[in-house]
Amino acid sequence: MVYNITSSNQYQYFAAMWAEPTAMLNQCVSALSQSYQTQAARDTVRQQFSNLLSAIVTPNQRFPEAGYRVYINSAVLKPLYESLMKSFDTRNRIIETEEESRPSASEVANATQRVDDATVAIRSQIQLLLNELSNGHGLMNRAEFEVLLPWATAPAT
């Protein structure tokens, strides 16, 4: 018994693009309360989101029978998740000085504004992702999944 792959674009469903819905929702709620003033803090939360994703289906392993899973590569969630991941990466863009050892007052003010802008962008993307998840976008169960990728059972003998 295997999934009946009829198109090359069906291989995407075997990638590590799946998450437990409750874990993803909880991560969004938790991340909204985090501070993003340092790159280390942004990296930590980005890694927490990344760690939620796993492969749950293989050509020989059927979609879980019970419950729903978040498919982060769905048309609605993919752009939100990608924007969120990009908003975490502000390394080497926060402080741009002519002399790193002695930033001027305007360079410090500019860096502070960039950190604030990054924080606003992160929170905005998390809230958008949370809204779509709460509305049920990007969630699939076995029946919905197997409309896209049929499970072929062995013929009775």
Swiss-Prot record:
Subcellular location as annotated: Virion
Claim: Secreted is one of the keywords in the record: no
Pfam families reported for this sequence: TMV_coat
InterPro entries: TMV-like_coat, TMV-like_coat_sf
SUPFAM superfamilies xrefs: TMV-like viral coat proteins (SSF47195)
Gene Ontology CC entries for this record: helical viral capsid
Major localisation: virion
GO molecular function terms attached to this record: structural molecule activity
Keywords associated with the record: Capsid protein, Helical capsid protein, Virion
Family: Belongs to the virgaviridae capsid protein family.
Function, in words: Capsid protein self-assembles to form rod-shaped virions about 18 nm in diameter with a central canal enclosing the viral genomic RNA.
Protein name: Capsid protein
